[in-house]
């Protein structure tokens, strides 16, 4: 789980990016596992977008590897009404941007790469800090039920038998 201050810093970066590129309609930071880290995606389901980003990332990574072009850096999809651009963001995350079809693609790449690097720095630093911190010891669980005090059992010499009564 990302600390609140780091989450706020990632969200600030996404909002600044949308200010620098006015044709952006959404921005999402997600883990490569498809889980949302932070988003500013009005009108788009962030969980669905993160899952689709992870799926397309898997294909892009394999394609780059199969063609001998090295590790994943970015992916651009052009649709009839706009663009979806995904950039590497550190070791374990990606930045996905949604843009109108009239966006300057060069500007989109320039700002997307910078923002991806910044988001990656924030997330990698938070991950490194989490690894340095000693793990919190879980609290001792409380018993589900308490034991009642047991009464002493009678011994064979104390118990009357059917023949003695």
Region roles according to the model:
Residues 1-24, 33-165:
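Acidic, low-complexity cytosolic segments
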């Amino acid at each position: 789980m990302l600390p609140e201050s780091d989450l706020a810093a990632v969200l600030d970066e996404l909002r600044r990016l949308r200010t620098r590129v006015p044709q952006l309609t959404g921005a999402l930071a997600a883990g490569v596992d498809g889980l949302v880290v932070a988003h500013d995606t009005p009108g788009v389901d962030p969980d669905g977008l993160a899952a689709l980003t992870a799926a397309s990332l898997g294909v892009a990574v394999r394609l780059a590897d199969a063609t001998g072009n090295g590790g994943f850096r970015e992916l651009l999809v052009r649709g009839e009404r706009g663009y979806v651009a995904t950039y590497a963001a550190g070791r374990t995350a990606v930045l996905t941007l949604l843009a109108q079809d009239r966006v300057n693609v060069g500007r989109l790449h320039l700002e997307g790469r910078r923002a991806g690097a910044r988001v990656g720095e924030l997330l990698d630093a938070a991950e490194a800090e989490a690894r340095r911190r000693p793990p919190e010891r879980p609290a001792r669980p409380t018993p589900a039920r308490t034991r009642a005090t047991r009464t002493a059992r009678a011994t064979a010499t104390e118990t009357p038998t059917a023949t003695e009564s």
